[in-house]
């Protein structure tokens, strides 16, 4: 009835997790404005996919509740950041189509490993669900007695919550890498570097999201991979990831010089 529906909507919109998301997104707006739209979209994707599973793919319920949650998050985050925004002047002006694009080989060097791991993991999960071999702790029970499900519904309902969360973050991270190849925001840079700030802000958050995903995926496949092939795959991915850490020596040296030479420390005069 209407009373139960109203209570349910209020409970979903005023969920403590939604309130915390609203606060932190408002905080992001004050600390780094770019994080405000980035994590509003990422949070929206996580909430939408979660609602799809929780409400058993009932279209109207999913979009109604997700829409109300999105409105609440936007409104509450604006209120949280309002004292700061009243005295803040944005540098960004307009959204433009990208005229220059990153060469494919450079994209592969920078992002090939995390994107390959993410999409390989998605393929593994889909294969398991189709073959009904998703046999690990946290997996929802099979719905053998129910009507035949669509492939998309079967995939979403067959994923453990942690897997769905990680896949959502991974897809969002891939989107953040690709977005500066399509559009950029006019701000403090011009000429050949007009995409620089847009690319830095988006790919920096993509790097963080990829880091969360890779840590989960490699351990997930090593512990619950199910086959030696997947365990070997995860170990190979771990070795490749460890090899990238070697670049830290070059990066630190290029910026700080010889860190073992105290006379080069600038301290407060840096």
Task: Please report, for each region that a protein language model flagged, where it lies by residue.
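Residue-level signature of transmembrane alpha-helical entry/exit and packing/kink sites
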Residues: 14-21, 65, 69
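Membrane-interface alpha helices of multi-pass inner-membrane proteins
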Residues: 19-31, 79
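Transmembrane helical bundles and short interhelical boundary loops of multi-pass, membrane-embedded
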Residues: 64-270
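Transmembrane-embedded, aromatic-rich helix segments that form part
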Residues: 35-46
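Membrane-interface helix caps and helix-loop-helix hairpins in membrane proteins
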Residues: 27-37, 185-190
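Short, glycine- and charge-enriched coil/turn segments that flank and shape catalytic ligand pockets
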Residues: 12, 16, 53-61, 155-156, ...
């Amino acid at each position: 009835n209407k009373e139960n529906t109203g209570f349910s909507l209020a409970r979903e919109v005023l969920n403590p997790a939604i309130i915390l998301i609203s606060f932190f997104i408002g905080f992001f707006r004050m600390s780094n404005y770019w994080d405000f739209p980035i994590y509003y979209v990422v949070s929206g994707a996580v909430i939408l996919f979660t609602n799809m599973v929780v409400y058993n793919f009932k279209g109207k319920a999913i979009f109604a509740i997700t829409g109300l949650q999105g409105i609440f998050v936007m409104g509450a985050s604006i209120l949280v950041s309002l004292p700061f925004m009243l005295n803040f002047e944005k540098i960004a002006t307009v959204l433009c189509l990208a005229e220059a694009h990153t060469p494919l080989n450079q994209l592969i060097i920078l992002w090939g490993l995390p994107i390959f791991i993410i999409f390989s993991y998605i393929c593994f999960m889909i294969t398991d669900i189709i073959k009904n071999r998703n046999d690990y702790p946290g997996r929802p029970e099979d719905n053998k007695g129910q009507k035949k499900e669509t492939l998309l519904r079967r995939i979403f309902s067959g994923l453990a919550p942690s897997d769905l969360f990680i896949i959502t973050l991974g897809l969002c991270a891939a989107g953040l890498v690709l977005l500066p190849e399509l559009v950029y925001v006019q701000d403090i840079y011009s000429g050949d570097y007009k995409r620089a700030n847009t690319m830095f802000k988006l790919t920096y958050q993509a790097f963080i999201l990829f880091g969360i995903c890779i840590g989960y995926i490699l351990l997930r496949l090593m512990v619950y991979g199910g086959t030696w092939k997947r365990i070997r795959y995860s170990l190979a991915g771990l070795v490749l990831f460890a090899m990238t850490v070697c670049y830290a020596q070059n990066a630190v040296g290029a910026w700080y010089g010889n860190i073992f030479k105290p006379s080069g420390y600038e301290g407060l005069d840096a």
